[in-house]
Regions:
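C-terminal intramolecular chaperone/autoprocessing and neck/assembly modules of extracellular spikes
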Residues: 23-94, 107-118
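Right-handed beta-helix
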Residues: 1-11, 19-20, 31-35, 79-80
């Protein structure tokens, strides 16, 4: 695939698809994140509580072991990361990163407060 759609530039890309629907790319997959494309930008609050409400799971899908989350559970915590097609729900894992970053920062603040108190 070659092209430039104004937001992503691809010069050479190989995608290997498995029968189970897994895709392997020979390059990095990125998502547009330019500030100029976004509006209503604000920091995520209560991220640590959100992470506390998430459940990481081990599972087997199509005979292959994996780790992740359950879309129906994530929908209750962070509905904007759950997508649905005709049959199944999926999770945009990359969109969870902002919550994880802010949760780590909240933990860091708590650790610093505890260190100062001791």
């Amino acid at each position: 695939i070659k092209g430039n759609d104004g937001g992503s530039s691809v010069t050479a890309l190989t995608i290997d698809m498995s029968a189970a629907g897994a895709a392997t790319f020979n390059s990095t997959v990125t998502e547009n994140s330019d500030e100029r494309l976004k509006s209503n930008i604000h920091t995520i609050d209560n991220a640590l509580n959100m992470v506390g409400d998430m459940r990481g799971v081990y599972f087997t899908k199509d005979g292959v072991a994996g780790t992740g989350v359950i879309a129906q559970e994530m929908e209750k915590v962070l509905p904007e990361v759950v997508k649905e097609n005709d049959e199944f729900k999926s999770v945009a894992y990359g969109q969870v990163v902002g919550v994880l970053i802010e949760a780590i920062k909240e933990l860091k603040k708590e650790v610093e407060t505890l260190k100062e108190a001791s």
